[in-house]
Amino acid sequence: MKIDPYNHQERWIRWKDKIQKLGVIPDLSRQNSEIILRYLSDMELGINTSMKSKKGARSFVRLNTIKTRLTFLSRKFKAILDTDDMTLLTEEQVCSFFVDMRNGVIKRLDGRRYKATRDFVKIFKAFWHWWQKVARKAGQTVEDITVYLDSSGEKPEWVYLNEKQIRIFWESCNLKYRTIVMFLFDTGIRAPTELMNVKVSDLSSDFKELNIREETSKTFGRRIKLMICSELLKRYVENNGLEREDYLFKFCPSVANRYLKRLAKKLFGDGKSLAGQNYSDLTMYDFRHCSCCYWLPRYKSESALKFRFGWKKSDKIHYYSEMLGMRDTISEEDLLIDVTKTELENRLSKSENKSELLEAQVETMNSQMAEILSHVSKLSEKIVILKNGSC
């Protein structure tokens, strides 16, 4: 069984039951309520999805995200564009809406600018492409009004801790959180999803390897080495009397994050870290970023680093590290790289020519030496004959 730390499945089922009783989504027009429910039904079954996306039903995480953002957009379209039917929107209307949202003309309830406009754009684009496919099946043609929508966006800020700060933070934690923090930093595991699904049986007998199972991973299963926290883990398991099928860590993610935030603020204040986020906003997931920064200069190959973190694309490396903590490690020995293959081949060719010349010279000398020895031998024989004759 896979642990669902945020209860996405329960939340989805509870919401569906509520809507079935009401018949519509509250505070939405009937047209928008019906089209959103139809879209969600297809996504729950994996029907009418993009040919480029993965096949099958969408996860409960995805379903909850679609539901939340589409209902939000529906209400905003009604308030700002005065439309009760999203399927009748024009290209100019949606482009104007999302530009205003990105530029802060359309504000949040607290008066601040939306930081994740691209997330709403992506949701709407996916919805519209679904609507185009459904209409096409019905023999109708729907124009793609999302072509010019900007789905780019600013990368979310996060909390960066360097190695010294990690050590200070780790030493200030209680035993339970000390183990969690070092485990997060060592493995770079996704928290809380992958983290809370780790069992004692996923650790090797010497606590130096971790198996992140396929069914608990967002991308793919992997077996990685524990280079920092193995001894700490061993003591933690022994002290808590954990058995093989026990989950390694049991805690409430929100409680854990509150603990980390309070401790970070106490140790480092409320200023901004190098990655832009305040220290007081530290969460478990920030240690995945910090872990990437730590391992990036230590891994010899990019593919090995991607494997450790469960990534398929190389751009994730920069996304998570932003090259923080990197340093210039070039040395004089590395200058050998500047010697081209051709130059090396030329040098090798010259060495081979010299070797052949030396071999020829040695062969000539051996021939000459043999001839000299032959003359010496003959001369010695003559001397012996002369001596015998004189006697």
Residue ranges and their predicted role:
Residues 103, 108, 149-176, 198, ...:
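Long, amphipathic, Lys/Arg-enriched alpha-helical "connector/arm" segment
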Residues 227-279:
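Active-site/catalytic core of tyrosine-dependent DNA strand-transfer enzymes
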Residues 163-192, 288:
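Basic, Lys/Arg- and aromatic-enriched nucleic-acid-binding interface segment
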